[in-house]
Amino acid sequence: MGNLLGGVSFREPTTVEDCDSTWQTDSEPEPEQPGPAGGGEGQQHDEPEQPKQPPERAGGRPRASPVPEDHAEAAGAEQGGESTEGNAKPKRSFYAARDLYKYRHQYPNFKDIRYQNDLSNLRFYKNKIPFKPDGVYIEEVLNKWKGDYEKLEHNHTYIQWLFPLREQGLNFYAKELTTYEIEEFKKTKEAIRRFLLAYKMMLEFFGIKLIDKTGNVARAGNWQERFQHLNESQHNYLRITRILKSLGELGYESFKSPLVKFILHEALVENTIPNIKQSALEYFVYTIRDRRERRKLLRFAQKHYTPSENFIWGPPKKELPERSKAQKTPTLPASGSNGQTSTHKKSKDSKISPGASHVNSKSVEEKKGASREPGEEADKPSPEPGSGDPKPRNTEKDSAADQSDSPPEKTVPDTAGKGECPTSSEKDGEGEDQSKDSENPENAGCHAEVVAQQNATNPQTSSG
């Protein structure tokens, strides 16, 4: 199988998005998807559309890039600075995303180059060989190193043996796991028992204890002292990443989520280990193979992350451009119609249609008198001598005479400007249209007719 894979070239992921399918089928809500909840069996369902990695080197052995490991410590240091300043926005690490992409996909193009009868990791856990270069057996580590926090802190060669992976670590004496060795390890009760004891020992070193067989964890009795140490020793974040990976390789995928959830709670809610939150979100969460579990953890983290605008691990906002477009579309016509409406109102306030004056000249006149600004009559003189002092009683007579003497065809309202002749009082409120009346011959004839009627019915008005 390894030889077949070795001859196939796959497209290498080039961005964080290529490596991360957490929100691939879910942008906001949490759908219930059928499939396994974790473990290596669920890995094919996890990220089926993601590109795969080409061979790391000629022999086909997956190479553990030192960049992600260095970046893990750097990320922890940056997170420590952020916890004090609170202003720096974190960034997704492509190196971390690619490293964990390979892990979740069980190392594309992985090719075992060790003989199946080597089984160095299994033999170490069966207490048959010591780990190198120290020469210490697993039973001694579990019995004598337990609780010796100075030794566990400063020795950097045992962790690769206690939690083996299918990638090379910093201890080149440690051997990578093989697929055959993984299957044999899972079937060996002695090895599994010691592996769980090693896990408990390291949890206690971090101030955590395993409370049941399902992987649930809680604070240990020494949690305050150990959390303070964990918050200040970022290189232990890399150890936690290795432990989580190894749990998944050796059949304990279900133990990951409880531990990661506990760490996120302590970092984001209790604020006991705030410096770890960057590594927890960038590394620990993404060791989990099931997308649904990752989404649950990230939603929990997003709920408690501060400042909330700096949370960069949430679902992509794919609908955002459509929303902004939908908001802009009704805004433009609304503003345009408002502008037209206001212009229309101004024209109606300044001009009275002939049809409206024919129906109710008095009511229109009162409205015009109310809307007329102070000083309007002084600024806009009337062309008629007697129009500057209108009398309501004469105006009513003029309107009545106008209604009785007007030809039938002029009683029809005409919006085109060919309607009734406005009365002299209405002309007082039509300062801006008086010039138009003088230019219109029909309006000029109407003026003459109105003046003649006024002289005949009320001589005082023409002489005043």
UniProtKB/Swiss-Prot annotation:
Protein name: Opioid growth factor receptor-like protein 1
Basic and acidic residues composition bias: residue spans: 43-59, 316-325, 363-382, 390-400, 425-439
Residue stretches of biased makeup (Polar residues): 327-342, 452-464
InterPro entries named in the record: OGF_rcpt (IPR006757), OGFr (IPR039574)
Protein family (similarity comment): Belongs to the opioid growth factor receptor family.
GO molecular function: opioid growth factor receptor activity
Taxonomic source organism: Mus musculus (Mouse)
Top-level taxon of origin: Eukaryota
Biased composition regions of type Low complexity, renumbered to the chain: 74-86
Region annotation (Disordered) ranges: 1-91, 309-464
Classification of source organism: Eukaryota, Metazoa, Chordata, Craniata, Vertebrata
Assigned GO CC terms: membrane
